[in-house]
Amino acid sequence: MTILANIEIRPTGPDNEFRAAQLLYTTAMPMFEFLYGPDRDFMFNMLAWQWQAEESLFSHRLALGAYDCDGHLIGLELGCDNRAEAAAFAGTHAVIRARATAEQQAHLSRSAPQLTYLTPHTPDGNYCVHNLAVDPHAGVKGLGRRLLRGAFEHAAKADYRAVCLDVLDNIQPLVSICTWAWIWPARCACPA
């Protein structure tokens, strides 16, 4: 078992794209499956391509990674402020135009607008954690909390007023981390 003290927490690069895609998928499985449709290869490739992009919603440039002693990516925190979100959305659209087939683009143009309520506006002066993932098989107790602490440290250095957490509430480890960090969830009821 790897202990937390042996984990390196640092900014990520464009490598480890397929591992990053797997970790990102765990943060919002139903959303990604709806967004990208039944073609799982396409879904994971899109997440990997966005990870490699300099600008996208899932760009490595927005992430802090957790690496084991062998250099494997075993966790990540990905977030930004509202100024970076506009460029990230534009970057994601560029990846879609460059990589998706016409049929895949048509599917995304139908599915993506239905998910806008899942991406709340980040208030000015705030940093928003959009994705927080840890490989449960890595067996590193406290890694999610350490990544979240990294987000708070980043926010403090950059003089953000607050840190927002944009996560789905059906992921129990995240609910536990939020309780640990004294983060109280805001509930939103969406019309049927």
Regions found by a protein language model. Give the residues of each.
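A short beta-loop-alpha structural element at the N-terminal edge
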Residues: E8-Q22, M31-F34, N82
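Conserved GNAT-fold acetyl-CoA-binding loop/helix
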Residues: A28-W51, T92, I96-T101
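Active-site rim helix/loop that mediates acceptor-substrate recognition in acyltransferases
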Residues: R40-A63, D68-C69, T116-L118
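Conserved beta-strand in the GNAT
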Residues: G65, H72-D81, C128, A133
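Conserved acyl-donor/pantetheine-binding loop and adjacent beta-alpha core of acyl/acetyltransferases
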Residues: R83-N126
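Conserved GNAT acetyl-CoA-binding A-motif
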Residues: G125-Y127, A155-L168
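Conserved acetyl-CoA-binding loop-helix of GNAT-fold acetyltransferases
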Residues: V140-E153, C178-T179
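Conserved catalytic-core motifs of GNAT/GCN5-like acyltransferases
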Residues: C164-D166, C178, I183-A192
